[in-house]
A protein has these predicted regions:
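Plant-skewed but cross-kingdom recognition/interaction modules and surfaces
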Residues: 97, 235-253
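Asparagine-centered strand-capping/turn motif at beta-strand->loop junctions
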Residues: 51, 138, 148-154, 290
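Short, basic/aromatic beta-hairpin or loop at an interaction surface
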Residues: 253-264
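Hydrophobic core residues within well-ordered beta-strands of beta-rich domains
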Residues: 132, 144-146, 282
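Intrinsically disordered, low-complexity Pro/Gly/Ser/Thr-rich segments with frequent PxxP/GP/PP motifs
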Residues: 270-283
Length: 304
């Protein structure tokens, strides 16, 4: 998906975050995998998410019943190849104690803010100065929202591609349908990025699938028939979307049967790189909620 320079901001899982106290300080600092520090954020109803300061990866999002709505591989190790996901997930992010105000941001019951500034070491990898701010928030209905802001702090123009990599927990991949991408063009990653048009009503899974859908709508639905729920993905500022499942193909950081329990629907901006002039800022919003399958679109209430 573009050259290595353009992949600077691609992440694994759900991206990077930084911690800031909310009104009732609903977070806990503790140790996670490999002794790395992680932050657990809770809202007044007991819903939560957790993030690692190294790489800032969101590794858990739980509803009030304690059910995790994100997928975590049994072999997760917070590592991965740079060319696929950029270097920001291999950096320690800092707490943004005084972030600039966010316009048109969904209201939240708990949130944290992170910041990452390019270092001298980073400039040797990608020679452009930037400031990346990220807010991760829980909404009143339990929805999870990630708001990314990237500012060009350099004296020259630069361009980049961008992507989040959420893996959603599902009952059984063979029972999953992805809706909202019908009649769109996509690049098939398993066929040398050959371009096709999807004429199906929805996407189902019976083998390995890796597609980059182009110019996608702002809402995509993942229907889990066994659990009778629908995961609703909403996005702004990310025109494309990746749909992926490894099926039974060997992947370094996946267990043998892990493929059955997740689906990746990833908001990305890769077909047309983002261009920022000095001082300009780009913003993207990613929001995910869970609703009962079959409810009317006007009356659906997230039950995360």
């Amino acid at each position: 998906m573009g050259n290595k320079a353009n992949l600077i901001f691609l992440w694994a899982m759900l991206v990077s975050v930084v911690v800031m106290a909310t009104r009732h300080r609903p977070f806990q600092r503790t140790k996670g995998i490999n002794g790395l520090e992680k932050i657990i954020v809770r809202d007044p109803r007991g819903r939560s998410f957790e993030v690692y300061l190294y790489g800032g990866q969101v590794t858990s999002w739980k509803n009030e019943k304690g059910e995790d709505l994100l997928f975590m591989s049994t072999k997760y190790a917070n590592t991965g190849p740079l060319p696929s996901h950029g270097f920001v997930r291999q950096r320690f992010w800092k707490i943004d104690a005084n972030p600039p105000p966010l316009s048109s941001h969904p209201s939240s019951t708990a949130h944290i803010d992170l910041i990452l500034k390019s270092s001298e070491a980073d400039l040797k990898i990608w020679p452009h100065k930037f400031v990346y701010r990220l807010r991760v928030a829980l909404g009143h209905g339990g929805d999870l929202t990630l708001t990314s802001r990237i500012r060009n702090s350099d004296v020259k123009l630069f361009n980049f591609t961008f992507g989040l990599h959420p893996y959603f927990s599902v009952s059984d991949i063979s029972q999953i349908q992805v809706e909202g991408l019908q009649n769109l063009d996509y690049l098939d990653q398993l066929k040398n990025r050959t371009r096709f048009t999807d004429h199906g009503k929805f996407i189902t899974f019976n083998s390995q699938l890796a597609r980059l859908y182009l110019r996608t709508p702002n809402k995509i639905r993942i229907m889990d028939h066994k659990k009778k729920k629908t995961i609703v993905v909403r996005k702004e500022g990310q025109a494309d979307a990746v749909v992926w499942n490894s099926w039974d193909k060997k992947v370094v950081d996946l267990g043998v049967e892990d493929y059955r329990r997740f689906v990746a629907v990833e908001p990305v901006e890769v077909e047309k790189p983002i261009i920022l002039k000095p001082g300009q800022e780009w913003k993207a919003i990613f929001q995910v909620s869970v609703v009962p399958s079959g409810c009317s679109r006007k009356s659906c209430i997230p039950h995360t």
